[in-house]
Amino acid sequence: MSTGISTDLHVHFGALNFSKTYKSGLSNRTVSFSRVGYAQNRKLSCSVSNTENVAPKDDERGKDRPLVKMCGITSARDAAMAVEAGADFIGMIIWPHSKRSISLSVAKDISKVAREGGAKPVGVFVEDDENTILRAADSSDLELVQLHGNGSRAAFSRLVRKRRVIYVLNANQDGKLLNEVPEEDCHLADWILVDSATGGSGHGFNWAQFKLPSVRSRNGWLLAGGINPTNVSEALSILQPDGIDVSSGICGTDGIQKDKSKISSFITAVRSVHY
């Protein structure tokens, strides 16, 4: 039996001059083949006998494309749409003052959907202390915690030794950073996320003027702030982040529920960019 590994909706083979063909439904799966044929016209055919869910590591998933984090997810339904489209991270707002805030029980349901689809559930915290964040992360089965406000960021040096952390830096409209990450602990964070001054507002900042600080995390950095299907290609081309974060840019008319067509358009735009 010959075996291939499917990532990013295509099957990789150890052959030269083999063009990749996208197949829906095979994202993040190990695929076994019962028959593989190679004809003289260099066409290869195969029959799939079995597929198995796998969850690639962050650094593996981002090798041929920027990672995608879809945030402000408020239901298992929206999480399923995001995962099916190819999101790598599913973000949830655990902050009562956000219109996209959810309960811990709903967050747990979303985490389940995310994990089953090979994505990582992320909880966004703003003003919570260390103990509150840890309890919420355990209760909701979060993979990462995102520290967005000064209150939550104050617990970073302690949390980063207990949980996988996304640390948020905010930039004003001119692209100037408004806060810093503790340099002595920055390397312990999984990701640095650069957002606009008001996250989830749909407002961005000047990408051309922005300068990424010299501090580095384990995996790299994510870009957020005013990202949508029409401008994500430009944002990626200018700044070339390791991943992109979208929230309001894929929402429907109510600004809360996600729009399937916008999600699809967003993913298509991201996949059109190659560094």
Curated annotation (Swiss-Prot):
GO terms for cellular component: chloroplast. It comes from Arabidopsis thaliana. It catalyses: N-(5-phospho-beta-D-ribosyl)anthranilate = 1-(2-carboxyphenylamino)-1-deoxy-D-ribulose 5-phosphate. Residues 1-32 form a transit peptide. Disruption phenotype: Bushy morphology, reduced fertility, blue fluorescence under UV light and resistance to the anthranilate analog 6-methylanthranilate. One of its GO terms (biological process) is L-tryptophan biosynthetic process. Catalyzes the conversion of 5-phosphoribosylanthranilate to l-(O-carboxyphenylamino)-l-deoxyribulose-5-phosphate, which is the third step of the tryptophan biosynthetic pathway. The keyword tRNA-binding does not apply. Belongs to the TrpF family. SUPFAM superfamilies: Ribulose-phoshate binding barrel. It holds the Pfam family PRAI. The gene is PAI1. One of its GO terms (molecular function) is phosphoribosylanthranilate isomerase activity. This is N-(5'-phosphoribosyl)anthranilate isomerase 1, chloroplastic. PANTHER family: N-(5'-PHOSPHORIBOSYL)ANTHRANILATE ISOMERASE. Its EC number is 5.3.1.24. It is found in: Plastid, Chloroplast. Induction: By silver nitrate and UV irradiation. Expressed in roots and shoots. InterPro entries: Aldolase_TIM, PRAI_dom, RibuloseP-bd_barrel, TrpF_fam. Keywords: Amino-acid biosynthesis, Aromatic amino acid biosynthesis, Chloroplast, Isomerase, Plastid, Transit peptide, Tryptophan biosynthesis. It comes from the Eukaryota. HAMAP family: PRAI (MF_00135).
